Amino acid sequence: MINNELFKILNVEKIPYAVIEGKHDIDSYKVENELFNPDIDIVLLTNSKQIISVLKSKQAFDYLGDCSFRENTTNTRIDLYFNSLNVGYYHYLKVHANSFVNQKLSEEEYIIYQILDPILKFSKYYPRHQCRLEKYFASVIPKEVKVKLESALGKSLSDALLIKISNKDFSISKIFIKRCKLRLLFINGNFVKMLKSRIF
C-alpha cells in the first residue's frame, strides 16, 4: 500500500505525514462484493497546498481534482488531508503531533476516522467499514475515542452512535446524519469554511 514515489516527494519537500491505515484493513477488503483497490489516504502537517502543484508536475500522478490524485503505475487513488481529518468543510479531528512522528494515525484517531468518515462521505457504512468497526468494538474502546468523539458531536449524538456500533447496528438514518453535520458546523471554524466554499 505504501507508494514509494509519493513518500520520496514528501521527504524531499520536508513535509511530515501520517498515513491513515488500521490493523484490520486487509481483512476488511475481503468482505466487499467486488474487487476493491485500496486508496492511500494521508494527512500532511502543512498549511501550504504547494504539494498539489508539485504532484501535478510529476508524470507518475494524474490529478483528479481538489486534493486527490491517481498513481499511474498501480492505479491507486491518493487522497491528501491537511493537518486534520475532514470531509469537505467538516473538519472533525486535528491529528496529534505524535502521529506525524510515527508517520501513522494513532489507533484512537483511526477508530474515530472509521466512525465518522463513512457517514459524512457516503451516508452509510460499507461492508469494509462495518468489518473494521466490529473488530475494534470487540474489545474495550479506548476512553480517548469517546472523549474526542464527544468534542466533535456532543455527548448525545456520540453516545447514540457508539451504542449503535457496539450493537452492530450500522443503519444510520438521514436525519441522524444531518444532526451530526449540523453539530460539526460549530467546531473548528467549519461554519466559516462552509460560507467560504459557497461564496467563492
Task: Set out the residue ranges of the language-model regions.
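Conserved NTP-donor binding/palm subdomain of two-metal-ion nucleotidyltransferases/polymerases, i.e.
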Residues: M1-F200
